[in-house]
Amino acid sequence: MAVKVAVLGGGNGGHAAAADLSNRGFCVHMYEDARFAGNIKKVFDTHEITMAGAAGNATVKIDMVTSDLQEAIQDVEFIFVAVPAFAHDVYARALAELVHPGQTVMVMPGTFDSLIFWKEFRKKGLEDVVVAETNTLPYATRLQGPGSTLIMSLFNPLKVGVMPACRTQETVEKLRAFYPSLEAVESVIACGLSSLNPIIHVPGCILNAGRIEYAKGEFYFYTEGFTPCVARTTEAIDKERIALLDSFGYASDIVAHGVGGSIITDDIGEAIASDPNFAKIKGPADTNSRYYAEDIPYGLAPWAKLARAMNVDVPVIGSMITIGSALLGYDCWTRGHSLQDLGIEGMTKEELKEYLETGK
């Protein structure tokens, strides 16, 4: 009998995960909020997704497509959350009412937000529920339309942190049935600080803002926009990220080693240029893109807030958030999740590491 899993979200990540997992023989319950279900009416009507690219070419049947969250997670052991970061609070509160002992929730990606799920679950007194997060979506993917997804590549390794960290080994062993390239890191904080999107999206978006607004999507983000000065800014952000990881005593590696290029190099510009998948990526079309609206307030800003609490200086990251706020017309420092939202405000480094390890 096929293993049942739930995939929450009907966007890029949700389409790719539902199609890939179904194609590999898992029984997939795909959920989309009723407010947005009309965007993927074709999938609701046909229960089919056409996939192409690195994970195979097929039109696959999705066992369940629903806007009933309780129905979606009924009798499943693993729940994969692939929704924008600004929706994580809503999903955390909703799942806290419905999850049951023995279930594992994996946020793809998390960028610390697994802590929001854990906080909400603890409020409900939930026992024997595990929350994991990945450092990126498992796939470099683009929707080609409702019910159609292009998977350009699969991330290998795909880093994962588990809350509580004391359950990492058993949890990752189970999750590798779905994502064999998973590589465990020390905690969900270590995983969140390994997130790729804030590093490789934000500097290019800010330094190419005029070109992005003018081109309206007819712009190859990496081929045209990832010039040497953008690469240097990216590496400056990366150094500050590594300094924060180092302050916790966590293992670290430069972003150039994690983007999946065909050569091994310490130069992020060379790494990006060596991967033909980056050359295909156009956009963003405007400053409403998730590259801005998600990766600055929900990506870089939580890093900077944690750095401030841990007395780690991150001036380049801070400048990106401040300039991003001016570009976007709203305060990216306050729009994203706070340490209070994550349930870790006021903790010393030692207290935080204990909480990450034990969940208490």
Model-derived regions, located:
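A non-catalytic, amphipathic alpha-helix used as a structural packing/dimerization or gating element
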Residues: 90, 170, 174, 229-247, ...
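Substrate/ligand-engaging "lid" and interaction regions
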Residues: 138-237
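Small-residue-rich helix-loop
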Residues: 230, 236-276, 280
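Long, low-complexity C-terminal extensions of enzymes
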Residues: 258, 263, 271-352
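Nucleotide donor/acceptor-binding cores
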Residues: 2-3, 129, 156-158
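Rossmann-like NAD(P)-binding element
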Residues: 57-99, 103-106
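NAD(P)+-binding Rossmann beta1-loop-alpha1 motif at the extreme N-terminus of oxidoreductases
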Residues: 1-53
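Rossmann-like NAD(P)(H) cofactor-binding subdomain of soluble oxidoreductases
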Residues: 85-147
